[in-house]
Regions:
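Trimeric beta-solenoid/beta-helix "fiber body" segments of extracellular/virion adhesins
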Residues: 3, 20, 37, 54, ...
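Small/polar residue-rich beta-strand/coil "junction" motifs that cap repeat-based extracellular fibers
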Residues: 175, 179-251, 256-258, 285, ...
Length: 319
């Protein structure tokens, strides 16, 4: 149905074409469905493809079992198979990539040869080209990823600027937002691990939790007043796994140099030092309606302990 639809068909069977020039070049391909101007235009021998929308699957020649729904969806696919694209320009640039699923405007739009990616949400995995085994759920999640592999992003703008980082997991809007090349990171919570572009093997759990280096684990932001559990933390102390044992560490002499003090924590200064991202109203992300939710507790909570710089100096003096 439509001018030039199925014009070149020779032995292809069970094809349906609706729209000007739909399935225009098909010769022997079978079981294809094309709906929209120039949909599946270049298909020759490809089978079991479904294209709905103007120029959807336009360049497909021999690719099989692809489904495209939306203007320009899977537009440049040639031999890629088992791809599903739903939304304007979704998987638009895919050529030979296989087993990709894109749902949302411009999702996986730049993918060319990447395989086994899943993108759900407008502009999710937008610039992925060759990355494989990535999963993005949420608007602009993994938006800038190009060649990064095995990343999982759940939440709007999660892993937004990741380009080449691998094996990252981000759950929560804006989690791991600024990561570009860091790998093996985990962020769970709204704004968790927001800053830091190249850290690796770090974990941030909780709203607005900040990571400042690789190989860190952080629980909660600086508004947290208690972290506890049924048992205490443990650390490796087994002599079987320690080498070069020597009694060279200062003991009592080091303790005598320490100066116990009482203090209040200036959380506003800490936020500035850690570059905690600001909200739209300019307040810290640990604030609500312009007032820090926990400030009354800060003011009342007198702490005791040591000054880190003084402990460091004592250690240096004793070698």
């Amino acid at each position: 149905s439509g001018v030039s639809s199925l014009q070149s068909n020779t032995t292809g069977n069970n094809n349906t074409a609706s729209g000007t020039a739909s399935l225009r070049s098909n010769t022997t391909g079978s079981h294809n469905t094309a709906s929209g101007v120039s949909s599946l235009y270049s298909n020759t021998t490809g089978i079991q493809n479904t294209a709905s929308g103007a120029s959807s699957l336009y360049s497909n020649t021999t690719g099989n079992n692809n489904t495209a729904s939306g203007f320009y969806s899977l537009r440049f696919n040639t031999t890629g198979i088992h791809n599903t694209a739903s939304g304007v320009s979704s998987l638009q640039s895919n050529t030979t990539g296989n087993n990709n699923t894109a749902s949302g405007v411009s999702s996986l739009s730049s993918n060319t040869t990447g395989n086994n990616n899943t993108a759900s949400g407008a502009s999710s995995l937008r610039f992925n080209t060759e990355g494989i085994l990535n999963t993005a759920s949420g608007a602009s999640s993994l938006h800038s990823n190009t060649t990064g592999d095995d990343n999982t992003a759940s939440g709007s703008y999660s892993l937004r600027y990741n380009t080449e980082g691998n094996n990252n997991t981000a759950s929560g809007a804006y989690s791991l937002h600024s990561n570009t090349t860091g790998s093996q990171n985990t962020a769970i919570g709204y704004y968790a691990f927001f800053s830091g572009d190249s850290f690796s093997n770090s974990t941030a759990l909780g709203y607005n939790t900040v990571i400042s280096a690789s190989n860190q684990v952080r629980l909660g932001n600086n508004a947290v007043t208690s972290i506890g559990g049924q048992v205490s933390w443990t650390t490796l102390s087994d002599a079987r796994f320690k080498t070069e044992n020597a009694a060279k560490v200062p003991g009592i002499d080091f303790i005598k140099k320490l100066r116990p003090v009482t203090y209040y924590v200036n959380h506003e200064a800490m936020n500035r030092y850690l570059e905690v991202p600001k909200g739209k109203d300019g307040t810290d992300r640990t604030s609500a309606n312009g007032q820090n939710t926990y400030k009354p507790e800060y003011e009342k909570s007198l702490e005791s302990g040591f000054m880190a710089q003084e402990v460091e100096q004592a250690a240096k003096e004793l070698g």
